[in-house]
Amino acid sequence: MEKYIMSLDQGTTSSRCIIFNKKGEIVSVAQKEFTQIYPKAGWVEHDPLEIWGKQAGVAGEALNIARISPEQIAGIGITNQRETTVVWNKRTGMPVYNAIVWQCRRTAGYCDELREKGIDKTIKEKTGLMLDAYFSATKIKWILDNVEGARELAEKGDLLFGNIDTWLIWNMTKGKIHVTDYTNASRTMLFNIHELKWDEELLEILDIPKSMLPEVKPSSCVYGETDEILFGVSIPISGDAGDQQAALFGQTCFNAGMAKNTYGTGCFLLMNTGEKAVDSKNGLLTTIAVGIDGKVEYALEGSIFIGGAVIQWLRDELRMVKTAQETEKYATEVEDNNGVYLVPAFVGIGAPYWDSYARGTILGLTRGAKKEHIIRAALESMAYQTHDVLKAMEEDSGIELKALKVDGGACQNNFLMQFQSDILGVEVDRPEVVETTALGAAYLAGLAVGYWKDRNEISQNWAISRSFAPAMEDEKREKLIKGWHKAVTKAMDWEDKE
């Protein structure tokens, strides 16, 4: 009986299940979108019960599409939108509030208060993260302080916290297992990445009871088995990593200096720094890349909040395109950006600027600016932001990048990939299997159950679909980048500080 690995890929806008074979090839995919909830400006929420329902649904669907039985699944890997925070009652299994999404800015003011007390330095030293509303810690505190009865339940030991991986595993095991992995824990702003444990001092500062937190384990190990009610059989849950770390693993960036960019809702650039946690001087995050083989490896990360989401905005709000794919056609219908820059700082701007008060702007408009120029500027904004992050990584790590591995939905846009290569001045490599986030989770799960022997075996699966080489003159590149930096400066510090 041929065996497969199931990967549950719980993203920001959709829940997916992808089944892989031994060669790392996709056997089947099932996907369902779920509701985005915007209660106030800058607030973003999801319904955890909807996420669980849709995730369980696509798992069954993927098995049906592949025409394989649950007995043929050797292990399940989970990868998830990171930082998004769920708090639930362990007795009833019901969330006390909606999941607060990584994009949500509601705790920006509280982060400013902590910064005034100098706590940002403590957080950076211990967790490798910037003090920001993006991470889980202040979201947990917000729920405890603002949801009626939540603090009392937490003090009694009745509330559990988890990122989406923890929430899924808890539900898959019918409440038996409350666990996360090192990569997800490293995104909470509560985990000491050097000592590899929840940090008592930070828990005290934020007034979060330790009893709420999950046990932290490696990214590749058997956490438990699915309850039989789910598939009719028990299947080992054996891999878990935050989406960006999973993509780094799926891209086989196993050596220090290897980097990838995932062009999803946000863009996320990670560079493997090996067993050394590199402290960033450029506003990048130091994070855990993977916990495997009895050790952890670290990475530098630059987070770009609005990547592919700018294309959704062009489609849904401005109605300039009917589909995301059309952006490539429009962008190539004009010779250049005609001096137009779009800074998509809809929810502030991330690395290396970190300004919660920046807002989106379109600059350089003249009477000759057309829809095509704005669409092109939107695509180019992803490449410029990637450039800024990559330059900061090179500076911090002392490693010059030779090539960039790419994945995520927008990497299928050939215009964007060519422009990315031109702006970076290095080769951009798109792999055969672009679902590297799900693939990384599958690899982690498969390694834990002996489906794959080791990383060397996995590396042999990686193949290039297309390579993009830089074709832009240095002078033109520098001029474009200078214009972009000028535009970013104009977008910063726009929103009034409360």
From Swiss-Prot:
Keywords: ATP-binding, Glycerol metabolism, Kinase, Nucleotide-binding, Transferase. The keyword Lyase does not apply. Pathway: Polyol metabolism; glycerol degradation via glycerol kinase pathway; sn-glycerol 3-phosphate from glycerol: step 1/1. It holds the Pfam family FGGY_C. It comes from the Bacteria. ADP binds at T12, R16, T265, G308, G409, N413. ATP binds at T12, T13, S14, T265, G308, Q312, G409. One of its GO terms (molecular function) is glycerol kinase activity. GO terms for cellular component: cytosol. PROSITE patterns: FGGY_KINASES_1, FGGY_KINASES_2. Its EC number is 2.7.1.30. It catalyses: glycerol + ATP = sn-glycerol 3-phosphate + ADP + H(+). It is an enzyme of class 2 (transferase). Glycerol binds at R82, E83, Y134, D243, Q244. Activated by phosphorylation and inhibited by fructose 1,6-bisphosphate (FBP). GO terms for biological process: glycerol catabolic process; glycerol metabolic process; glycerol-3-phosphate metabolic process. Sn-glycerol 3-phosphate binds at T12, R82, E83, Y134, D243. Belongs to the FGGY kinase family. Homotetramer and homodimer (in equilibrium). Key enzyme in the regulation of glycerol uptake and metabolism. Catalyzes the phosphorylation of glycerol to yield sn-glycerol 3-phosphate. This is Glycerol kinase.
